[in-house]
Amino acid sequence: NPTLLGYEFVRKAMDDLGYDYMAFTDFHFKDDLQYEGAVPMLKRLMETAAQEGLSFGVKLTNTFPVDIKRQELPGEEMYMSGKALFPLSISVASRLAESFDGKLPMSFSGGADQKNIDQIVDCGIWPVTVATVLLKPGGYKWMTKIAEKADSCEIGKCGEVQVETLKKLAEDSLTD
């Protein structure tokens, strides 16, 4: 979940990327699983899976709750996805990849689209799913391009994430 990054990181990233209008408090950051608790838990799950002859990985990421301020939808919260979510999701992936030396298998759905699917897969993250891009007007026209870009990638062994390549992708996403 993007909340693993901490409130300060996420607020700064959103502000720096021009999403300063997105309103959220630190509530979900305090209420959700903390990074310091997530890493040991994931290690235990990987160890248990290995003992059973199985593998364990993570799917990144969920949507990110933001406050409804202009009556965009009924209720109090809506959930960020798509382009705005990508820098957060790829940053979570990078941080986890570093903590696990690239040995934690990951799948991805946080803002993948025709512009970045090949970069995500080239980092050793797969499968990758897309949704938000398809919901936009004309979104289905991107399916062929997305499929072609994904198909051009060499898929490595599951659980071999390219830590440095992913770190650069995450850093670049915070300035694009």
Q: Can you say where each PLM-predicted feature lies in the sequence?
A:
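A cross-family glycoside hydrolase active-site/sugar-binding cleft signature
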Residues: 1, 59-61, 107-109, 131
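Glycine-rich phosphate-binding active-site loops on the catalytic face of alpha/beta enzymes
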Residues: 119-146, 173-175
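Gly/Ser/Thr-rich loops at beta-strand to alpha-helix junctions
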Residues: 1, 112-115, 135-136
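Glycine-rich beta-to-alpha transition loops that act as phosphate-gripper elements at the mouths
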Residues: 64, 104-117
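Extended, intrinsically disordered, low-complexity segments
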Residues: 141-176
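Short glycine/threonine-rich loop-to-helix capping motif typified by GTGT followed
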Residues: 70-74, 117-123
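Glycine/Thr-rich beta-alpha phosphate-binding loop at enzyme active sites
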Residues: 2-102, 137-152
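A structural signal for short secondary-structure junctions
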Residues: 52, 99-102, 112-113, 120-126
